[in-house]
């Protein structure tokens, strides 16, 4: 059993242990993804971000 959540009609998160909401929609995991120090795919992820212009250095500067 894992902690799950769904969004109610007001947009608020409702936490539950069930796999589907009362509206018969799938619930989402409330746990963050695992972080591994041994990141095998970081080189590929950076290459894809560079190719599609998604790196922060490729974005226009933020104005405050």
Swiss-Prot record:
UniProt cross-references to Pfam families, sorted A to Z: Nop10p
Summary of subunit composition and partner proteins: Part of the H/ACA small nucleolar ribonucleoprotein (H/ACA snoRNP) complex.
GO BP: rRNA processing; rRNA pseudouridine synthesis; snRNA pseudouridine synthesis
GO molecular function: RNA binding; snoRNA binding; telomerase RNA binding
Gene (UniProt): nop10
Top-level taxon of the source organism: Eukaryota
Cellular location(s): Nucleus, Nucleolus
Organism: Dictyostelium discoideum
InterPro entries in the cross-refs: H/ACA_rnp_Nop10, H/ACA_rnp_Nop10_sf
Gene3D superfamilies, alphabetized: H/ACA ribonucleoprotein complex, subunit Nop10
Protein name: H/ACA ribonucleoprotein complex subunit 3
Signal peptide, first to last residue: none
UniProt cross-references to SUPFAM superfamilies, sorted A to Z: Nop10-like SnoRNP (SSF144210)
Record function comment: Required for ribosome biogenesis. Part of the H/ACA small nucleolar ribonucleoprotein (H/ACA snoRNP) complex, which catalyzes pseudouridylation of rRNA.
GO CC terms, sorted: box H/ACA snoRNP complex; sno(s)RNA-containing ribonucleoprotein complex
UniProt record similarity statement: Belongs to the NOP10 family.
Alphabetic keyword roster: Nucleus, Ribonucleoprotein, Ribosome biogenesis, rRNA processing
Keyword rRNA processing belongs to the record: yes
């Amino acid at each position: 059993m894992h902690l799950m959540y769904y969004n109610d009609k007001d947009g608020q998160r409702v936490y539950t242990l069930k796999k589907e909401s009362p509206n018969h929609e799938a619930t989402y995991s409330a746990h963050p993804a695992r972080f591994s120090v041994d990141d095998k795919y970081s080189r590929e992820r950076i290459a894809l971000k560079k190719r599609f212009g998604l790196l922060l250095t490729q974005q226009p500067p933020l104005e405050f």
